Design a protein with these regions (language model features):
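Outer-membrane beta-barrel signature, preferentially recognizing the C-terminal barrel domain
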Residues: 252-279, 304, 348, 396-411, ...
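Acidic, small-polar-rich N-terminal luminal/periplasmic segments of exported/outer-membrane proteins
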Residues: 23-156, 269, 431, 435-437
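Repeated loop/turn-to-beta-strand initiation elements of outer-membrane beta-barrel proteins
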Residues: 186-189, 229-235, 279-284, 321-325, ...
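Transmembrane beta-strands of outer-membrane beta-barrel pores
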Residues: 165-169, 195-199, 239-243, 290-294, ...
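Flexible loop and strand-edge segments within Gram-negative outer membrane beta-barrel domains
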Residues: 198-206, 210-216, 226, 230-284, ...
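Outer-membrane beta-barrel translocator/receptor signature
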Residues: 103, 118-120, 126, 131-204, ...
Length: 461
């Protein structure tokens, strides 16, 4: 696929207007209580907003194009999947501002779509790692962090704005606009909107690739600030919509003459983050989130809805050469599926609660030891909601599983020189039975008996 940005226009508005502002003032640090901790080999890759801007990234494939451990497949946003060392995002723990991005609406589409313009930092951990990575991080974890108004304002600026227009030679346009400013000395507000219109692109031989045209719209609003000198709070809302005519399997190549089907994917996410920096013994971080996502379309015009909510509460204690992080997280997922027009036919519910502790100890200035443990409790239920021939529910009795798993990790990192580091580690990660693919719920739920079927020998991965 060839892709070239031929033209890009960016307009900014700020107050006060400072055209000759010195570089030193531009880089002036704003008030922040966020700590930066060196955690050894826990983070294999970190991408900053400056890196993303340098890449001129338009999607996640551009963001990770120079990351050998991470690849992104899929020619349209709805079909993009993230892979770490060949394992797709279903086996990763992906968070956006601490909100876990889980569950699968349809196994031929992705679960993570983000606008690069909103990203402040990305941390990637390849492979099973630390206890703080969250549940189910078999293939690793990716932590996305979004910008706020304070990140965009410089110096004494009180408000600002940006308008951006891009044209792609391979049949596409992108327009975005943002407004940001201070509500008070300690609070800021960021509003962002973008729209992308792509026609079918052409491959390297000039052949049109069918099923790659799509319209994407994104709205994002984030308020953030200090409720006290040592307490920070941010609240954000995001709404994303993507429409197009895709093949029966959007991430597959469309064969000549194959039909395309009108499809639409939607996602609404709400996140609240809180930080309390009391002392070296108490650095409290809390996240609460709720996500609703849906997909309608495909060959059979099916509709799948997933609702997710959860929280993560952790504290970090810094004692001499040792840093301890410990906490609890919880997530619950609910999926319903059925025809695009008609009653819901199948449903599943799943939850996981984790308790974790992770430590980093500087044995010597050159030697770092990391060690941790995580306990996860998994609960899963499935239910058939369809009626029989006479209008009587097939069954209202759910069937389920309840299991738990303990995971350990330990690692060493030795700084040989300024340019060379030697690392050694062992880590475990567990992934219990989760809610299924919304498209295939009806394929394995029922065997003709009175209750749904869950294999009794299913154990966490």
């Amino acid at each position: 696929m060839k892709k070239l940005v031929l033209a890009s226009a960016v307009c900014t508005l700020s107050s006060p207007v400072v055209f000759a502002q010195s570089l030193e003032n531009q880089n002036e640090e704003t008030k922040s209580i966020e700590r930066v901790a060196v955690v050894g080999a826990a983070t294999n890759l970190s991408i900053t907003a400056e890196d993303i801007e340098q890449f001129q990234a338009n999607d996640l494939a551009d963001v990770f194009r120079e990351s050998p451990s991470v690849s992104v497949g899929g020619s349209v946003g709805v079909a993009q999947k993230i892979f770490i060392r060949g394992l797709e995002d279903a086996y990763l723990n992906v968070t956006v501002d601490g909100a876990q991005q889980t569950s699968t609406l349809f196994h031929h589409i992705g679960r993570v779509t983000l606008d690069p313009d909103l990203l402040k930092q990305i941390d990637v951990q390849a492979g099973a790692g630390e206890a703080t990575s969250g549940p189910g991080a078999i293939g690793g974890s990716i932590r996305f962090k979004t910008k706020d108004a304070q990140d965009l304002l410089r110096g004494d600026e009180q408000f600002g704005g940006r308008v951006k227009a891009s044209y792609f030679s391979n049949e596409g346009t992108r327009y975005s606009g943002s407004l940001y400013g201070k509500l008070s000395d300690s609070w800021g507000l960021l509003g962002y909107y973008s729209t992308v219109d792509r026609d079918n692109f052409e491959d390297g031989d000039g052949n049109e690739v069918l099923g790659t045209a799509a319209d994407q719209d994104l709205m994002f609003l984030k308020a953030s600030g200090y409720i006290a000198d040592n307490q920070y709070l941010s609240i954000s809302a995001e709404q994303r919509d993507e429409e197009g005519e895709f093949s029966a399997r959007p991430n597959w190549v469309v064969l000549e003459g194959a039909p395309l089907y009108p499809s639409e994917a939607e996602r609404d996410t709400y996140v609240a983050n809180y930080r309390f920096d009391h002392s070296a013994l108490v650095f409290l971080e809390a996240t609460a989130y709720q996500t609703s996502s849906s997909f309608r379309g495909g060959r059979f015009d099916f509709l799948s809805d997933i609702d997710t909510y959860g929280f993560d509460i952790r504290n970090t204690t810094d004692i001499s050469n040792h840093v301890f992080t410990y906490g609890i997280d919880y997530r619950k997922d609910e999926v319903e599926s059925g025809p695009g027009v008609g009653p819901v036919q199948n449903a599943e519910k799943g939850s996981v609660m984790g308790i974790y502790a992770q430590a980093h100890s500087n044995i010597t200035p050159e030697l770092l030891l990391s060690y941790g443990v995580r306990y996860d409790d998994f609960d899963f239920q499935q239910q058939i909601l369809i009626d029989d021939y006479y209008g009587t529910p097939v069954t209202d009795e759910p069937s389920g599983l309840d299991d738990n798993e303990l995971s350990f990790n330990v690692g060493l990192e030795y700084q040989l020189t300024e340019a060379w580091t030697l690392g050694l580690g062992y880590a475990e990660a567990a992934r219990g039975k989760q809610i299924g693919d919304g498209f295939t719920l009806d394929e394995y739920l029922y065997d003709g008996e009175d209750v749904p079927v869950v294999a009794s020998d299913v154990v966490p991965e």
